[in-house]
A protein has these predicted regions:
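Interhelical loop and helix-boundary elements at the membrane-water interface
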Residues: 1-19, 26-132, 143-180
């Protein structure tokens, strides 16, 4: 996704992300309504990747992919190409690092269920990514952006905003403000 933003023209990215977002929403809604063909296919293909709240639900709750595509669309519209690509890179890599480190190495848990190790992995990877992709940006701005992105991930349940949506928006805003 970040590569698409960097390589394709902005308007093409906007149309592509809009098409994918609407298609994803329609397919997920069909799965929620248990529509025979689309719903069954969706459940067979993605059941193992969905979180518990996305599988067992009394109301339509979009999966993380909807939030990722919505964030990609908004970042592409609102931020520079470089900021949008960097923001999505932070979300894709750092959120994965946090989940993996938290799951396999997490020993100290906070009250929100997040682990110290996962949170540290998010911050370190976000700082590393931003140090490379925003190498001209002042170190203090990179640290602040990584810290705010980590906060968006850490406080996901309290903010009631999916971190796949909040991380790229916070990161992209800060990068546009400080650097791009």
């Amino acid at each position: 996704m970040p590569l698409v933003i960097r390589l394709l023209e902005r308007n093409i990215c906007i149309l592509l992300f809009l098409f994918l977002l609407l298609g994803n929403l329609l397919i997920e809604y069909a799965a929620y309504r248990k529509m025979p063909i689309v719903g069954g296919l969706f459940r067979r293909m993605f059941f193992k990747t969905l979180r518990r709240k996305e599988v067992i639900r009394n109301e339509f709750i979009p999966s993380g992919s909807v939030y990722i595509l919505a964030a990609a669309l908004i970042c592409t519209v609102c931020f520079t190409q470089a900021a949008a690509a960097a923001a999505l890179t932070v979300m894709l890599i750092s959120d994965s690092c946090a989940a993996l480190f938290g799951k396999f190495f997490g020993t100290f848990r906070f009250s929100n269920g997040k682990s110290l190790e996962g949170t540290a992995a998010f911050f370190i990877s976000a700082f590393g990514i931003l140090s490379v992709l925003a190498w001209n940006c002042p170190l203090s701005a990179v640290l602040l952006t990584a810290a705010l992105a980590t906060g968006a991930e850490f406080w996901e349940s309290r903010l009631k905003i999916d971190d796949n949506f909040s991380i790229p928006l916070v990161t992209g805003f800060m990068l546009n403000l400080f650097y791009f």
